[in-house]
Regions:
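A short, glycine-/small-residue-rich helix N-cap motif at loop->alpha-helix starts
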Residues: 11-22, 112
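Conserved donor NDP-sugar-binding/catalytic core segment of glycosyltransferases
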Residues: 12, 46-82
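Acidic donor-binding segment of Leloir-type glycosyltransferases
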Residues: 1-13
Length: 227
């Protein structure tokens, strides 16, 4: 049948990462292998007309395109403004669309904070291309992180550790994100989360080889911005 609704219960806590992917995976488990594109969309989005058709057109255009998405906009005093938390080459976690083979190559989505970064890093590791379309303006009704609870504040630093960023890249990424959110003190939470994860010896989300690729890619992107 065309549509199947699943009812899944969990705690009322708003914690980034695992809960949303557990819900996604529950739906994924209902699928057979007869699909070409798989999407992970949040429920608080309003898409422009022909969003899906435009996404499909990109996948048809180039077989090496593995991940496509538009941009999230939030309501600020009655005006829809770009939710500017990431680089323009990043597809936000709220609106991911994957080619099946790319989705298989990256091993699906990780049940962890940072899942919406590691997916793109692993896609590039497997030589897939990522496309973002500025013309696809998606209204995001609940700004990212607005309802996260206190337990979530160290999760970002934990994610940087589990992505094998290393301390220097973590410091740079933490400072950038804290400034983008206009919450400078978040920087300290991110760094504390990194060291808590290191002390706890939490498992990494990527292999040593993948981690080496990720660090090289991050340094390359930073150098490109400076030059």
């Amino acid at each position: 049948k065309f549509l199947n609704i699943l009812n899944i219960s969990s705690s009322g806590e708003h914690i980034p990462g695992s809960k949303v992917i557990n819900a996604f995976n529950a739906g994924l488990n209902e699928l057979d292998e007869n699909y070409d594109i798989i999407c992970k969309f949040d429920a608080d989005l309003i898409f422009p007309e022909n969003y899906i058709e435009t996404i499909i057109s990109y996948f048809k255009k180039d077989d090496r395109i593995g991940l496509v998405g538009g941009f999230c906009f939030i309501d600020k005093n009655g005006e829809w403004t770009l939710e500017n938390l990431t680089n323009e080459d990043h597809v936000r976690g709220a609106l991911k669309a994957y080619r099946k083979n790319c989705f298989k190559d990256i091993g699906g989505l990780k049940t962890s904070m940072g899942w919406d970064t590691v997916d793109e890093l692993l896609a590039q590791y497997h030589n897939w291309q990522i496309v973002t379309d500025k013309k696809l303006k998606v209204k995001h009704l609940k700004p990212t992180g607005k309802t996260y609870n206190k337990k979530a504040k160290y999760k970002q630093g934990e994610a940087f550790y589990r992505l094998r960023y290393g301390l220097i890249i973590t410091i740079i990424a933490s400072l950038k994100l804290a400034l983008l959110k206009r919450k400078p003190l978040f920087f300290l939470d991110y760094i504390k989360g990194y060291f808590q994860a290191k002390k706890a010896n939490l498992p990494f989300l990527v292999s040593e080889k993948e981690g080496e690729f990720i660090r090289k890619l991050r340094w390359k992107k930073m150098k490109e911005k400076l030059l």
